[in-house]
A protein has these predicted regions:
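Acidic/polar surface patches and capping/hinge elements
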Residues: 1-445
Length: 445
């Protein structure tokens, strides 16, 4: 132990300005910083593959992640799942760490040796195992699976984070090593779950894509089709079969809403005309809203946007790492389950977009390559606003307002009908309520 204390002294005696900046950066919070890194990776990989010469589209392969198209294509469902797995693994790992902290009750190095500089905020929390290293271990293990082509970058961030905790006087090396090992061990449970959660089959195949169309036609409706040239297969049409976090598969199916208005109904004609009039008469305010909530290609997606909103509100609260992790896990499990219920609904009804029913509608944002009903933005936003309103009740009205604006942005952009958006918000709220049930019964409140 004395040798480990001396290692800190050696680092501090030779500390550079760059190292001081890194200490400041990482001391903002481990869960926060790794969520930012995850959002960065999602944005980097949120790029739909370009077509082959024969008009077909290639699919990214996890077995060859650096070949074009690079794996993953982190579209909204993939991203929602990534945020959920990383957050849930970090939370469970930190809960376990808190047990061992209390059991071993090792004081922080700066409390053992007062000659050490303290370069981070002090606390009475036992230092073994290091909570930061637990977060690192869980993040690295999950991100290796989710972003296999980025392991060098991920490992470099992990080494930087661990080294900073020693330089700062917060932890000795054995605190770090124990924390990282614990984080990795807990995350392995989530890796095993992820490998069997059916996400690997979410892209479907030609037979499935054809059946979605013919089933819709058999109901007397007009099926959705890709408006891209050449036509692109629908985005992850079997994602609705992925294993949920907050409820079982029967509950997921029960959350599927009733059908959209029939394509031949007067209501659908009216809703199509409403979108056409919005597009014909855009305002600067509405156009700004469209772009603010677009969250399209090369962004961290709608779930990432809500993580960003949450993080900004969590920072002033000075939550502990385990509280941060719990909040992010509740939020991101809600967003993943919202994606699952939403994608189940989209591909069950296979309903067309406004531009398909009226080609005169010229959209103000990109047209997503999947069916309209229900709106993904609306479902994500309803779920996020609901659980965030529980976590920070004084912000509940603001979150609801944001969710409504995000939902309306898809109408203003010309890519969704009113029924897509209104029903999507309600479905999202229903999913978010399951997260509240989890929160009120997990013993942490």
């Amino acid at each position: 132990y004395i040798a480990q204390i001396n290692e800190i002294k050696s680092f501090q005696a030779n500390i550079t300005e760059d190292e001081k900046k890194l200490v400041s950066y990482w001391s903002a919070g481990a869960v926060l910083r790794w969520n930012e890194i995850l959002r960065e990776l999602v944005a980097k990989h949120n790029l739909p593959p370009y077509q082959n010469a024969d008009g077909t589209y290639p699919f990214p392969s996890p077995n060859n992640p650096l070949a074009y198209p690079q794996f993953p294509f982190s579209n909204p469902p993939y991203a929602a799942r990534a945020y959920a797995y990383v957050s849930a693994a970090q939370y469970d790992a930190l809960v376990t760490a808190w047990y061992y902290k209390k059991r071993f009750n090792r004081a922080a190095p700066y409390k053992v040796d007062s000659s050490l500089q303290v370069l981070v905020p002090t606390s009475d929390l036992p230092s073994y195992p290091s909570e930061d290293a637990v977060v690192v271990g869980a993040a690295v293990e999950m991100l290796k699976m989710l972003f296999p082509g980025d392991q060098d970058f991920i490992q470099q961030k992990a080494e930087e984070h661990k080294r900073v905790r020693i330089i700062s006087g917060a932890n000795v090396r054995s605190d770090i090593e124990a924390g990282e090992a614990l984080g990795r061990a807990v995350a392995q449970k989530f890796v095993t779950r992820a490998r069997g959660d059916r996400a690997g089959a979410a892209a479907g195949n030609q037979a499935m894509w054809t059946k979605l169309e013919t089933d819709c036609t058999a109901r007397g409706e007009t099926p959705w089709y890709s408006l891209e040239l050449p036509k692109r297969p629908p985005m992850l049409p079997a994602f609705g079969k992925v294993k949920t976090f907050l409820f079982d598969s029967l509950t997921a199916v029960s959350l599927r809403p009733g059908p959209p208005p029939s394509v031949s109904s007067q209501q659908m004609k009216d809703e199509t005309e409403e979108i056409y009039q919005m597009i014909k008469n855009p305002t600067r305010e509405r156009t700004a809203i469209v772009h603010f909530w677009a969250d399209g290609v090369a962004t961290d997606t709608p779930p990432g946007h809500w993580d960003e909103i949450a993080a900004e509100d969590f920072i002033p609260k000075n939550f502990s790492e385990v509280r941060w992790a719990r909040n992010m896990a509740l939020l991101n499990m809600s967003l993943m389950d919202a994606a699952i219920v939403c994608w189940d609904t989209k591909n069950y009804y296979f309903n067309p977009r406004p531009t398909q029913l009226n080609p005169k509608i010229k959209t103000l944002t990109g047209i997503p390559n999947f069916p309209a009903y229900i709106s993904g933005h609306s479902t994500f936003s309803g779920a996020a606003a609901t659980i965030l309103g529980h976590i920070i009740p004084e912000r509940a009205t603001a979150y609801d307002d944001m969710a409504r604006e995000a939902s309306l942005s898809r109408m203003y952009g010309g890519i969704h009908f009113r029924s897509d958006c209104e029903v999507g918000l309600t479905v999202g709220e229903n999913v978010g309520n399951y997260a509240i049930q989890r929160a009120t019964t997990d013993g942490a409140e």
